């Protein structure tokens, strides 16, 4: 297996121009495909997950052109739901941001489409979304294991009263929200359980509004969506920088700055993961906010005990930053780590122990006490981009670290290690 050994990094300083947000890129691509008119997306992320969405849209007959660096996409909207000519199978890798929204959108009208992906995708639950779509009339068949992809979709979603469990993934609700305006009837979506990762729902609602559709949000407990609507292209749309990707550089500055400035997000960003900067500030770093940047300067870091449900992806970065904080850090309410690219609670606990931390892994929390000195370790990445990027921070100690399968960052940030080297 390929590996990358990072030598100890004495100091970080500089500016990082962030790649586009994965969450925003894939939502914007799908809405642009469903909309009337031509949309030009700029600062689009070029990564595996986005390529899976683009390939699926092409297979569904959507016409688009990409710039040479794949960050500008001109897409001709379909002016309504997407249809395949005959039976079709779409391979979506391990891209949840493609699998979940497409599973819903392709239930409009009549289709015969199979959605499948990598082995890990077949372990990521989708039953709550399927249950909700079936309530709205969709005909969906599990082709292997009940509640998991691959799925056969045969259309039929018309709207109506739909319940969805919000406790596992906000992507199920996102998928329903983006699809419901195109259904023939009105849809009332009721949330069962506690809704996780609420800020990701705000990204969805924000983008839908940009494409001309507003819905009634009743305190995140119920959403009322008028049927028979259509999305309208905004003309051009700039994809924000990826706030989850920003977390590694901001944390590096908190540990070994200097000052690092990330551009492409700022105080008005729609992504909840910008709140990661508040957590670093609470730990002792100095944060400065601009309209299109966030900067972080080193501070004496102290442990925290916090509910991280609002920033589940960026919270992983706090788990490795905790290795450099005084005291025991506890991250709570993060059960949904278990249903991401890998079981991130198990993976994080396992790899933190390798570098010498004392770790308690709970059902939905992790407690981390750093060692006096970090051990050298070979870090397994579980084909999870965030594991690779999080554990690069170990090199900010006086100990090298080896990252196995470093290219797994291609899911969201193909040139991550080059960017880290630029500020080191």
Swiss-Prot record:
Disulfides per UniProt: none
EC category name: transferase
UniProt-annotated location(s): Cytoplasm
Gene Ontology molecular function terms on file: 3-phosphoshikimate 1-carboxyvinyltransferase activity
Pathway assigned in UniProt: Metabolic intermediate biosynthesis; chorismate biosynthesis; chorismate from D-erythrose 4-phosphate and phosphoenolpyruvate: step 6/7
Entry binding sites for phosphoenolpyruvate: 22, 96, 124, 171, 344, 386, 411
Catalyzed chemical reaction(s): 3-phosphoshikimate + phosphoenolpyruvate = 5-O-(1-carboxyvinyl)-3-phosphoshikimate + phosphate
SUPFAM superfamilies: EPT/RTPC-like
E.C. designation(s): 2.5.1.19
GO terms, biological process: amino acid biosynthetic process; aromatic amino acid family biosynthetic process; chorismate biosynthetic process
InterPro entries: Enolpyruvate_Tfrase_dom, Enolpyruvate_Tfrase_sf, EPSP_synthase, EPSP_synthase_CS, RNA3'P_cycl/enolpyr_Trfase_a/b
Binding site for 3-phosphoshikimate: 22-23, 27, 169-171, 197, 313, 336, 340
Keywords (A to Z) from UniProt: Amino-acid biosynthesis, Aromatic amino acid biosynthesis, Cytoplasm, Transferase
Chief place where the protein resides: cytoplasm
Domain of life: Bacteria
Keyword Cytoplasm (UniProt): yes
Any single GO CC term annotated in Swiss-Prot or TrEMBL for this entry: cytoplasm
Catalytic residue list: 313
Functional note: Catalyzes the transfer of the enolpyruvyl moiety of phosphoenolpyruvate (PEP) to the 5-hydroxyl of shikimate-3-phosphate (S3P) to produce enolpyruvyl shikimate-3-phosphate and inorganic phosphate.
Stated family: Belongs to the EPSP synthase family.
Quaternary structure (record): Monomer.
PANTHER family (UniProt xref): AROM/DEHYDROQUINATE SYNTHASE, PENTAFUNCTIONAL AROM POLYPEPTIDE
Name of the protein: 3-phosphoshikimate 1-carboxyvinyltransferase
Organism: Shigella dysenteriae serotype 1 (strain Sd197)
């Amino acid at each position: 297996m390929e590996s990358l050994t990072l030598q100890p990094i004495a100091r970080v300083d500089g500016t990082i121009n962030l790649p586009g947000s994965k969450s925003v890129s894939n939502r914007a691509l799908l809405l642009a495909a469903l909309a009337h008119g031509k949309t030009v997306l700029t600062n689009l992320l070029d990564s595996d997950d986005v390529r899976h969405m683009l390939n699926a849209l092409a297979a569904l007959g959507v016409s688009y052109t990409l710039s040479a660096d794949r960050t500008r996409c001109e897409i001709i909207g379909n002016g309504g739901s997407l249809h395949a000519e005959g039976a079709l199978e779409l391979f979506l890798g391990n891209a949840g941001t493609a699998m979940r929204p497409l599973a819903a959108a392709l239930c409009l009208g009549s289709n015969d489409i199979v959605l499948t992906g990598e082995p890990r995708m077949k372990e990521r639950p989708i039953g709550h979304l399927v249950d909700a779509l079936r309530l709205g009339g969709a005909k969906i068949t599990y082709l292997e294991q009940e509640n998991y992809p691959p799925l056969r979709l045969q259309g039929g979603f018309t709207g109506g009263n739909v319940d969805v469990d919000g406790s596992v993934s906000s992507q199920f609700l996102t998928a329903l929200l983006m699809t419901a305006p195109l259904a023939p009837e009105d849809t009332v979506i009721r949330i069962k359980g506690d809704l996780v990762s609420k800020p990701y729902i705000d990204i969805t609602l924000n983008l839908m509004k940009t494409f001309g559709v507003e819905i009634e949000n009743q305190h995140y407990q119920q959403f009322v969506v008028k049927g028979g609507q259509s999305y309208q292209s905004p003309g051009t749309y700039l994809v924000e920088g990826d706030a989850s990707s920003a977390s590694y550089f901001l944390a590096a500055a908190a540990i070994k700055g200097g000052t690092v400035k990330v551009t492409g997000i700022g105080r008005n960003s729609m992504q909840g993961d910008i709140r990661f900067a508040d957590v670093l500030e609470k730990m002792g770093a100095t944060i400065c906010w601009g309209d299109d940047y966030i900067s972080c300067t080193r501070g004496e870091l102290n442990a925290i005990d916090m509910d991280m449900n609002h920033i589940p992806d960026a919270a992983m970065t706090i788990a490795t930053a905790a290795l450099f904080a005084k005291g025991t850090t506890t991250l709570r309410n993060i059960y949904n780590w278990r249903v991401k690219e890998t079981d991130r609670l198990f993976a994080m606990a396992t790899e933190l122990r390798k570098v010498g931390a004392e770790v308690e892994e709970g059902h939905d929390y992790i407690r981390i006490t750093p060692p006096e000195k970090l051990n050298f370790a070979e870090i397994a990445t579980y084909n999870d981009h965030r594991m690779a990027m999080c554990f690069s921070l170990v090199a900010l100690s006086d100990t090298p670290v080896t990252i196995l399968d470093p290219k797994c960052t291609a899911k969201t940030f193909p040139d991550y290690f080059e960017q880290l080297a630029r500020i080191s």
